[in-house]
């Protein structure tokens, strides 16, 4: 049998075995595991001398698996494993063997023993092996090992003692490690085991560790892992055992620990052990007494002196050791800050006593701990610096909170704050080791951003100190930057940036109306001006960090650059500064930079700067008639669109470049129309001739390129090139629009019509023609359809209703596409909703949609049917479907496939489109003769839902709102919307009211109460849906009222047909009808949800 297992295990682990062979071997091994004598078989596999390490490992792993199963976890089986494994282990560890077991096997043995411990130790396990620790101490001759201080002690005995410690560590990890989430039952069992250990074994273990720490140094050097495992044990167990077992009155135990602080092999374990000890939870005053008693600061004085005298003492070789030490000292300081917080929050303590304790703790920090941590923070290794950050966060928060408690509080800390800020300045600088973008990003994330946050807290604590220090730092660097490294200049710009952030966010605590004239603002303006006057030096710099940071600084602080306080005697005027900034952007420093990341970022920032400084730019364009031509000529090389290759997805390998190139098109469009809008000073109306010929300089190359694409035919590269050109034209149109119309008026058609000139309309009519010609050639390609919709959406505000003839053709071409994707239809429906909103009062638009509605609805249904067919085909052919299981709040799992997701999104977009008819008062379209045949289809879509769709609450909300509004607008068969200018008062559709009643009433009651819908009224989204259902019932009641006969068809249907049919009690029926007929809208909705649905749901 053992040979057979060996063959199977080898087959499973052999990389040359095929999948079928491995699967068969695993099945056979599982069969052996399920046999009655499985424990005996795998014990034999472990202890057999002929078993190799792989077989032993597999055997031990299987024993763990078998012991944790209910069938084998019986006293006889556990005792068998206990007896055989401990006997074999004694020979392996203590026998005079030349080769010891590898670590991975020893760890697995520890896991077996830990499993036995968890199943047999303490009264919660039936007291099966309460002598666990005694037996293993005897097995490994622990008493002999710790009582023999002779250097000739048997090495195997020491190894056995080390193994015993590691076993204790694994047990502690199982019962006390807080990083694992355990069940309540498991936690109670672990607590029971810990209580049992406290009562019976912890003192023995503590004594073992104590004796280990007393061993002769030669023995320690013979087996350094023994001391490390001992220290690890103390650090691991200290969180839940009595502290007095480790800390005695004479600190003898602790002194034994301290003696390993300076041993190379034990330093890290010693630091971690002390860290765990000082982190032991105690009451604040007990903790303060404890921290003072252990006298750790005296033990650490050596390290403070060492690093102060020789910072280079920390090297890559010993970095891990120093990181552990830094973490220890940081944690030591944090414990004192926690004491401060706890004392301050204790309501029982006297105020004067609190202040005394806080002052005492603060003095300890300032005198003994902070000087050491400042040295570590100032170290050149980022990892050392970062280890100190948790303490600074706590301590600066303490200073910020208590700065107002005493007039002398801040002055007492001024030296610290001054030193701390100076170190922040130094450690913010990039080092020579940071050479790649990844290096810079890592430094920013781990060090610089945190130091920036610390600076911001210092501003709040002592504004004058911060402003004085940062001003001196920036001034000195600006003065000497030409002789310094690039890192110094980059840091200078970064600190100016930080000063601006502190000023804009008002960390200085100024009145809002004083910020722009305050000293921080004046200082910032001075630095920005000095930086701009260094143009020649800037342009000569070839460093991407500086180039990007400078542009970001200028764009984000434009308001300071052009503020009234910026016009000092030494500063150039606004126009000159503006032109200076433009020239910097349009140079090799920025937009023509040889580095792609700088170039692309500058394209965005250039356009952002133009839009932010709209008023300044408009003034300059009015004074400089040829400026727009100069700018266009300079950046025209960047407007050329080129597709060199495409990837497997059919997109450009340089898509990122094109996406950023669109910012330039937007920016140049913005400048062109802003230039012409500046002529408002002399032009009275939108019809005054204004020259837009400069547009031809941009559009003509694009049109020529499009013509070439049409001539070449539909290759993938040509199609992508056409897509890019159309997107560029649409983005140019967006820039032209926002340059001409104020930002807060871009959607106001009246303002648009007034400000947009006829000459611009003429040019964009030509653009619309070109787009339609291109689209007609390539309309079967979805990215062309996407780009065409995008561009037409940007032309609408400019052409207004003059775009409708073009839109008509566009819609026809899109609907004629045979391969229209669901996401395209979603976008298209949104596009059409925008048209309805903008032109709902236009007769031509009304006629357009009157003709469009039926084919559009048919197209939506066609796509939904295609989605359903695709899903059915995948299911029937067992093809893999991209799925995700979504657990809803009502604990109903819905399998969400791509097709299901597409269908839900399309239905939501469809309902939103229908909503646009009611929102814009054009519901009469739905009642017209031409659309009367499609109306039943639309209404059926709104009253038919699957159980899965009910769970899609966002879609249901839109759908129910549309249904409510339809009932409100034409629920009795006639158009009831008085704002609908196209309604026919003589038109009525008979039977529509009865249809709404018979279809909607069942929905109102079935959705909340039918179990298949899993309607959870306690969940927020479903409660909102319940309010929508109440509104639906109320709208039915209102529209069904007949003032002539005083009858209500809705009430009639409820009381005589539906409610008796579902066997609603008579008293509830009377109450419901009474509330429906007497309450207002909001009152009835609240009653229906809280007192009808919620109450009845409780009885289900």
UniProtKB/Swiss-Prot annotation:
Gene3D superfamilies for this protein: Leucine-rich Repeat Variant (1.25.10.10)
GO cellular component: cytoplasm; mitochondrion; nuclear matrix; nuclear pore
Localization terms from the record: Nucleus; Cytoplasm
Keywords, in A-Z order: Cytoplasm, Nucleus, RNA-binding, Transport, tRNA-binding
Pfam families: Exportin-T, Xpo1
GO molecular function term, any single one: small GTPase binding
A GO BP annotation: tRNA export from nucleus
Disruption phenotype: Leads to the accumulation of pre-tRNAs.
Source organism, top-level taxon: Eukaryota
Regions annotated as coiled coil: none
Family: Belongs to the exportin family.
Function description: tRNA nucleus export receptor which facilitates tRNA translocation across the nuclear pore complex. Preferentially interacts with tRNAs with mature 5'- and 3'-termini and does not distinguish between intron-containing and spliced tRNAs. In the nucleus binds to tRNA and to the Ran-GTPases GSP1 or GSP2 in their active GTP-bound form. Docking of this trimeric complex to the nuclear pore complex (NPC) is mediated through binding to nucleoporins.
Additional remarks: Present with 3490 molecules/cell in log phase SD medium.
Subunit structure: Interacts with CEX1, GSP1, GSP2, NSP1, NUP2 and UTP8.
Designated name of the protein: Exportin-T
